[in-house]
C-alpha cells in the first residue's frame, strides 16, 4: 500500500473510500424501505452494459453494477453470478453478443447467496443444463430460495426460486473445465459461504492473476457479536480478510462494479494502451478500507451491543 503521506496515494485512497461508501449504499439491502418482491432499487442493477473481454478468456456479461463473468474454455464455459430474477435474459444476450452459445454453459458459480447475485440461477440451470457449484454455508440458502439466510430469510422481498446444488465447494477447491482452473476461496461473513474466485489467465503473452471479490462488506443491521443464527460472524469476517490480504492480485474484480470502479475502467479500456483492470494497488486499498470499516463496526457493537433478534 502506498505511504499515507503521499499526495497521489491519499487521492487514490479517498477515491477508494468514496467507492466504499457508494458500495455500502448499493449493497445495504436491508437498509432500504421494504420493496415489492424482486423490485430492483438501483437502476444500474438492471441497465445493460455492452459485454466486453476483460483479459484473455475472461469476459464481462453483467449489468452496469451487478457483475457477471463468463470464462470461456475449450470444453464449454463457466458463468459466475446469475444476478437478479430478471437478469438471465440480459446475461444470455451479452454472452451471445460475444459470439458464444448459451447452451455451452457447463458450470454456474456465484459470489454469494444474496438475491442480487443468485436469484436467476434456477432459470439458467433449467435452460442450459449447467452444474451448480456453491460454497458450503451458502448451500442451504440457495436450496431454500433464500429462506435459510441468517439476515434476510424472513423477508419475502429478498427470496428467490430455489435451485439444487450439484457440487458443494470448500475453501481452496478447484473448479476445472477444459484448460481452465478457478479456485474458490471462502471469505465468509457477508454470507456464510461468501466466495472470492481466483484464476490465472494469459493475455498478450503475459500471465495475470484475476481476483473476483465476493463481498467483504458489513451490511447495516448485521449483529457481528450476538447473532444466534450466525454466532461466528465476526470470526469469519476476520478470517476472510486474512485470506483476501494473502491473495496475489493483478486484475481486480468483484461482485459489484462499484467495488473496483468498473464503469471508469471500462471507459479507459477502450483507449488505454494498458489494461485498466490491472489494479493491484486498488485491490489492496479496497480490502484495507473494508477491513477498517469492519473493525470500526465491531468496536462500536462491543461498546453498544445490538439487540438480539428473536
Language-model-derived ranges and their functions:
Residues 2-27:
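N-terminal secretory signal peptides and thylakoid transit peptides that target proteins
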Residues 199, 204-206, 218, 229-309:
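Divalent-metal (often Zn2+) His-rich catalytic cores of metallo-beta-lactamase-fold enzymes
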Residues 57, 71, 81, 112, ...:
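Divalent metal-coordination and catalytic microenvironments
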Residues 87, 113-119, 139-142, 192-195, ...:
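Active-site environment of divalent metal-dependent phosphoester hydrolases
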Residues 38-40, 48, 53-55, 104, ...:
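Metallo-beta-lactamase
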Residues 44-98, 102-104, 196-218:
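Conserved beta-strand hairpin/beta-sheet module of binuclear metal-dependent hydrolase folds
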Residues 80-82, 106-113, 133-135, 187-188, ...:
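Active-site neighborhood of phospho(di)ester-bond hydrolases with catalytic His/Asp-centered motifs
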Residues 86-89, 96-174, 271-272, 278, ...:
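Active-site HxH/HxHxD metal-binding segment of metal-dependent hydrolases
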Amino acid at each position: 500500500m502506498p505511504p499515507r503521506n503521499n499526495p497521489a496515494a491519499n487521492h487514490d485512497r479517498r477515491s477508494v473510500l468514496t467507492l466504499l461508501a457508494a458500495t455500502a449504499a448499493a449493497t445495504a439491502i436491508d437498509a432500504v424501505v421494504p420493496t415489492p418482491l424482486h423490485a430492483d432499487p438501483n437502476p444500474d442493477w438492471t441497465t445493460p452494459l455492452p459485454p466486453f473481454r476483460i483479459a484473455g478468456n475472461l469476459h464481462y456479461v453483467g449489468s452496469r453494477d451487478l457483475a457477471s463473468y463468463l470464462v470461456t474454455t475449450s470444453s464449454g464455459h463457466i458463468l459466475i453470478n446469475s444476478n437478479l430474477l430478471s437478469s438471465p435474459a440480459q446475461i444470455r444476450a451479452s454472452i451471445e453478443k460475444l459470439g458464444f452459445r448459451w447452451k455451452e454453459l457447463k458450470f454456474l458459480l456465484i459470489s454469494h447467496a444474496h438475491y442480487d447475485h443468485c436469484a436467476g440461477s434456477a432459470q439458467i440451470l433449467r435452460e442450459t443444463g449447467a452444474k451448480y457449484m456453491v460454497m458450503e454455508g451458502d448451500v442451504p440458502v440457495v436450496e431454500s430460495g433464500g429462506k435459510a439466510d441468517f439476515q434476510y430469510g424472513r423477508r419475502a422481498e429478498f427470496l428467490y426460486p430455489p435451485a439444487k446444488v450439484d457440487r458443494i465447494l470448500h475453501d481452496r477447491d478447484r473448479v476445472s473445465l477444459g484448460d481452465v482452473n478457478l479456485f474458490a476461496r471462502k471469505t465468509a461473513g457477508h454470507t456464510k459461504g461468501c466466495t472470492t474466485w481466483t484464476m490465472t489467465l494469459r493475455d498478450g503473452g503475459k500471465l495475470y492473476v484475476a481476483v473476483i471479490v465476493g463481498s467483504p462488506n458489513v451490511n447495516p443491521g448485521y449483529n457481528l457479536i450476538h447473532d444466534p443464527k450466525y454466532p461466528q460472524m465476526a470470526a469469519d469476517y476476520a478470517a476472510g480478510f486474512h485470506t483476501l490480504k494473502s491473495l496475489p492480485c493483478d486484475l481486480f474484480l468483484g461482485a459489484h462494479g462499484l467495488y473496483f470502479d468498473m464503469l471508469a475502467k471500462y471507459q479507459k479500456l477502450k483507449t488505454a494502451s494498458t489494461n485498466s483492470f490491472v489494479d493491484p494497488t486498488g485491490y489492496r486499498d479496497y480490502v484495507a478500507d473494508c477491513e477498517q470499516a469492519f473493525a470500526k463496526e465491531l468496536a462500536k457493537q462491543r461498546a453498544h451491543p445490538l439487540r438480539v433478534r428473536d
